[in-house]
């Protein structure tokens, strides 16, 4: 079930403060965060976030199309290396 409209989108306070400070100073430094649960709001457009995926920080540049999604959606936590091809030698026995 989606979040109630009267509550508004969830954004961690420390993340919002860092974006506001950068907007005041007109700087665009990478903001390192572990907050994958934060919703992307219009204030984030044009900023780059380094979102933690469990072992490293993945750079995510926020665009208009990302507004309303969560930061964690753009930093995958699992790596898919493909299915193993059948071993033909084992089948001949």
UniProtKB/Swiss-Prot annotation:
Write out the GO MF terms: rRNA binding; structural constituent of ribosome
GO terms, biological process: ribosomal small subunit assembly; translation
What GO CC terms are in its UniProt record? cytoplasm; small ribosomal subunit
Query: One matching Pfam family, short form?
Result: Ribosomal_S19
Xref: SUPFAM superfamilies: Ribosomal protein S19 (SSF54570)
Keywords of the record, alphabetical order, are: Ribonucleoprotein, Ribosomal protein, RNA-binding, rRNA-binding
- Read off the PROSITE patterns from this record: RIBOSOMAL_S19
Please report which protein family the annotation says this sequence is part of: Belongs to the universal ribosomal protein uS19 family.
* Matching PANTHER family: RIBOSOMAL PROTEIN S19P FAMILY MEMBER, SMALL RIBOSOMAL SUBUNIT PROTEIN US19M
What is the purpose of this protein? Protein S19 forms a complex with S13 that binds strongly to the 16S ribosomal RNA.
Would you tell me the protein name for this molecule?
Small ribosomal subunit protein uS19
Protein species of origin: Mycobacterium leprae (strain TN)
Q: Lineage of the native species?
A: Bacteria, Bacillati, Actinomycetota, Actinomycetes, Mycobacteriales
